[in-house]
Amino acid sequence: MGEVKIFDTTLRDGEQSPGVSLIPEEKLAIAKQLARMKVDVIEAGFPISSPGDFEAVQIISENIRDVEVAALARSRKKDIDRAWEALRNGGDPRIHVFIATSPIHMKYKLKLSEEQVIEKAVEAVKYASKYTSNIEFSAEDASRSQPVFLYRLFERVINAGAKVINIPDTVGYAIPEEFGKLIRDIKENVSNIDKVDISVHCHNDLGLAVANSLAAVENGANQIEVAVNGIGERAGNTALEEIIMALYTRKDFYNIGINQDTTQIARLSKLVSNLTGMTIQPNKAIVGANAFAHESGIHQDGVIKERTTYEIMDARTIGLKDNKLVLGKHSGRHAFREFIQKLGYDIDDETFEEIFIEFKKLADKKKNITHVEIEALIDNHYHTFDKVYELDYLSVNTGNKVLPTATIKLKKENNIIEKAACSGDGPVDAIFQAINEIVGIDDIKLISYHINAVTEGKDALGEVIVKTKIEDNTYTGHSAMTDITEASALAYLETINKFLTSEQTRQTTSAQEGI
């Protein structure tokens, strides 16, 4: 049985989704969960593109030791130098260099001939080799490139030292039959191809990213580049959860082994959704809310009698658990910590105490608390950053004949309490206006505001996801509570704290290209 490596690019290509911007601490939280899942490679960013990306790659490479950490670089010496500077303290760092190879890119973007592109690619791989032997080379827009040119190019860069050859469908143009044939033809026509891993990186513009990646595996590819929830530029990338579960569920057909812990999928998906602010559509394969739901009476009856009549996967395989009652107001610290550990979370003592306090508050409002609600509380604290402001007091007055008004008190770092009372178009707007008055940030715009019910019932936990734009940078805030007005205030305040504590520049530079 063969094996396929999983190369995750959520933190690089995934972050290029419109409106997504992650601070380094959030990227590290995602990287840690990817490591728990045992992906083979984590592409942590594009170091030369911004100070924030550089910092994120540096932090991740220093903290994640059991997984290869990669950084992207154009075929330019300054890009490669910057990538290595960020990676140098990692365990087994990978430099991922790329250059465009399609006629349209070479003519209009690069203004280079085929031979000039080959020379630049070879020079880049040789230059990267002075830092590490772990080098991946990508031919950007390979699916629209001339195959014979790709054969020549790949043979040369392999001789120069590349250990992985990546074949991207950069604009999502390919269909499975032709993409599979491209991989097969490359294997048959590049004389030294057996010296390297063959990787594919498919975009989803025609909804075929997963299908194209699987076609590539059938024809000899042994690395697939993916993103959690399929996020990425335009229509996104190959979805990590779909590829892994397709190979796992249909191992009888593909005869491929995977090393990933599938039970981490649900938590990873939720974490990425919370931090990016990109909600998961209910009918999304594998991780959507409806993925294991059955409305039809015939289907329900069949599943009750025998699950496999209508379910090809067990929900527990991806880490979903029955929504059973687990804890209540009489549960103590020991039981609560033990339960969190059983869920797979590794939390320091200070964070544990904060979560335990929130749990006790929730237990006073609800008789029974499910593991889903406990995980939502953990998500409130699981990714940490410095808090310039903390909510101390909130009061909202609203009604159909009353001008909505919110009174807010915030504690600052030095414990000075600042207060403001503002009106708005509704209670949430009034809360946001009051916070704005205290923090004094003029250039702040609300991009999106979402409320989701974590559980059912009148005492359900409400999850609020807020996205703001502050000085051209986008920030996402998340909070889950039974009181959605308080959750709204906390989520909004989180975006402001991220802005105030963020030291990196998030503006996209001309270096932000993709493969």
From Swiss-Prot:
| GO function terms (MF aspect) | 2-isopropylmalate synthase activity; acetyl-CoA C-acetyltransferase activity; manganese ion binding
Catalytic reactions of this protein: 3-methyl-2-oxobutanoate + acetyl-CoA + H2O = (2S)-2-isopropylmalate + CoA + H(+)
The record's section on SUPFAM superfamilies has: 2-isopropylmalate synthase LeuA, allosteric (dimerisation) domain (SSF110921), Aldolase (SSF51569)
What positions does the domain Pyruvate carboxyltransferase occupy?
Answer: 4-264
Which stretches does the entry tag as region Regulatory domain? Answer: 390-515
Q: Can you list the GO cellular component terms from the UniProt entry? A: cytoplasm
* Places the protein is found: Cytoplasm
Where does it mainly reside? Answer: cytoplasm
**Pfam families hit by this protein:** HCS_D2, HMGL-like, LeuA_dimer
Sequence positions that bind Mn(2+): D13, H201, H203, N237
Q: Keyword annotations for this protein? A: Amino-acid biosynthesis, Branched-chain amino acid biosynthesis, Cytoplasm, Leucine biosynthesis, Manganese, Metal-binding, Transferase
Q: In which pathway does it act?
A: Amino-acid biosynthesis; L-leucine biosynthesis; L-leucine from 3-methyl-2-oxobutanoate: step 1/4
| BP-aspect Gene Ontology terms | L-leucine biosynthetic process
Name of the top EC class for this enzyme: transferase
Q: Give the E.C. number(s).
A: 2.3.3.13
Cofactor annotation = Mn(2+)
As for what it does, the entry says: Catalyzes the condensation of the acetyl group of acetyl-CoA with 3-methyl-2-oxobutanoate (2-ketoisovalerate) to form 3-carboxy-3-hydroxy-4-methylpentanoate (2-isopropylmalate).
According to the record's subunit comment, the protein's assembly and interactions are: Homodimer.
Q: Which family does it belong to?
A: Belongs to the alpha-IPM synthase/homocitrate synthase family. LeuA type 1 subfamily.
What is this protein's name?
2-isopropylmalate synthase
Organism of origin: Halothermothrix orenii (strain H 168 / OCM 544 / DSM 9562)
Q: What is the lineage of its organism?
A: Bacteria, Bacillati, Bacillota, Clostridia, Halanaerobiales
Gene that encodes the chain: leuA
